[in-house]
Regions:
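Conserved redox-cofactor binding core of oxidoreductases
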Residues: 102-219
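N-terminal glycine-rich phosphate/pyrophosphate-binding loop and immediately adjacent elements
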Residues: 1-114, 118-121
Length: 220
């Protein structure tokens, strides 16, 4: 029996696994991804526009202490949790890395924001992150697509916040507001945590793993 030889084996095909496999494949590395679930088609396998009572599956039992409420959405399949995440994509700031310096609590990381900023740039270009450059110290600006338009209720909230000296900004999400060759732009259906049938929202299966498989250097 012939045995395939791989340079790297990655366990899990979510955001980390998919991104790593994609970048290794571009550098000529032969990669195997070990995934415990099936392949999922985000366009057809989710009841994206259905109500919860229309779902054919039952809730997965979870261990809960007493009556403490805990909601956990899980995904086992190619793409992992990226199939269900809401895709809010915020950069950590220098304050996050240097908690003791700024807040007097915790420990400072041995790296700072400037060390990983170039990697934020790279991944934002790859997956497509929408938002505004708001110039906030705690939420560093990135490489953004145009933001998702505010709803009427958002405008009301923003006016109220301004009257109190606060600020409301557009959400920063790994969601396309401008179409690409392989993905459509968001049409604001509000079901980001149920697949995304136009792949406007990032998922590692479509954005990273599928192209990597087409290169012939990645096997799931």
């Amino acid at each position: 029996m012939q045995t395939d030889i791989f340079d790297v084996v990655i366990v899990g095909s979510g955001a980390s696994g998919g991104t790593l496999a994609s970048h290794l494949a571009r550098r000529g590395v032969k990669v195997a991804i070990v995934e415990g679930g099936p392949r999922v088609n985000t366009r057809t396998d989710f009841n994206t526009h259905a109500m919860p009572f229309d779902f054919p599956t039952r809730q997965v039992p979870t261990m809960r202490p007493g009556k403490v409420g805990f909601d956990s959405e899980r995904s086992r399949g190619v793409g992992g949790k990226t199939m269900l995440l809401n895709a809010v994509a915020l950069r950590l700031s220098q304050r996050d890395f240097k908690g003791r310096t700024f807040e007097g609590a915790g420990e400072d990381w041995p790296i700072g924001y400037k060390d990983i900023a170039p990697y934020y740039d790279t991944i934002e270009r790859e997956v497509g992150v929408c938002g505004n450059r708001d110039g906030l110290e705690d939420l560093p600006d990135g490489i953004f697509l145009p933001p998702v338009p505010l709803k009427c209720s958002d405008e009301i909230l923003r006016r109220a916040a301004r009257s109190l000296g606060g600020q409301v900004i557009h959400v920063r999400k790994a969601t396309l507001t401008v179409p690409t060759k392989t993905r459509l732009a968001c049409h604001f259906c509000g079901n980001c945590m149920a697949g995304c049938d136009v792949v406007a929202k990032y998922n590692s299966a479509d954005v990273h793993i599928a192209p990597a498989e087409q290169s012939g250097r990645v096997t799931v």
